UniProtKB/Swiss-Prot annotation:
Cell compartment(s), UniProt: Cytoplasm
Organism: Thermoanaerobacter pseudethanolicus (strain ATCC 33223 / 39E)
Protein name in the entry: Ribosome maturation factor RimP
Signal peptide interval: none
One Gene Ontology biological process: translation
Record gene name: rimP
Family: Belongs to the RimP family.
Keywords: Cytoplasm, Ribosome biogenesis
HAMAP family: RimP
Pfam families in the record: DUF150_C, RimP_N
Primary localisation category: cytoplasm
Alphabetical list of SUPFAM superfamilies matching this protein: YhbC-like, C-terminal domain (SSF74942), YhbC-like, N-terminal domain (SSF75420)
Described function: Required for maturation of 30S ribosomal subunits.
Superkingdom field: Bacteria
InterPro entries: Ribosome_maturation_RimP, RimP_C, RimP_C_sf, RimP_N, RimP_N_sf
């Protein structure tokens, strides 16, 4: 996490805790000629536009007071979306029993992607039901995990 991302995280936590929101991620990056500070939040039942506005206004005021960013930037506060990557233990726990896609750094059985039902997460292992069989993956070998969205 960059210094600016850490500052934004520290500044936003009081309003998140007060409203029982979860901080999913903070990103500070340049896209084209613009810098973006993105804050992704969530809560049980989902985030609303009013929730995003509340957090955005609060964080904007705090950032103006501290002024940690020397150049212009765009502040965005949003929900992480349905297909957000699973990163934290809570993300995995929330998705037990659901379909996920696992991407690996190196292939296993000539495959780098596996899709199956998440049946267990131990912190250092992901266990899915893949083709009717239990399959384990060490987190150190996993590059990305995301939910499978079916409509």
């Amino acid at each position: 996490m960059s210094k600016i991302e850490q500052i934004a995280k520290d500044l936003v936590m009081p309003v998140l805790e007060k409203n029982n929101f979860e901080l999913v991620d903070v990103e500070y990056k340049k896209e084209g000629s613009h810098w973006y500070l993105r804050v992704y939040i969530d809560k049980e039942g989902g985030i609303t536009l009013d929730d995003c506005q509340l957090v955005s206004e609060y964080l904007s005021d705090r950032l103006d007071e501290v002024d940690p960013i020397e150049h212009s930037y765009i502040l965005e506060v949003s929900s992480p979306g349905l297909d957000r990557p699973l990163k934290k233990p809570r993300d995995f726990e929330r998705n037990i029993g659901k379909e996920i896609e696992i991407s690996l750094y190196a292939p296993i059985d000539k495959r780098k992607k596996f899709e199956g039902e998440l049946i267990e997460f131990t912190g250092d292992k992901i266990i899915i039901l893949y083709n009717g069989e239990r399959k384990e993956f060490d987190m150190k070998n996993v590059s990305l995990v995301k939910p499978v969205i079916k409509f």
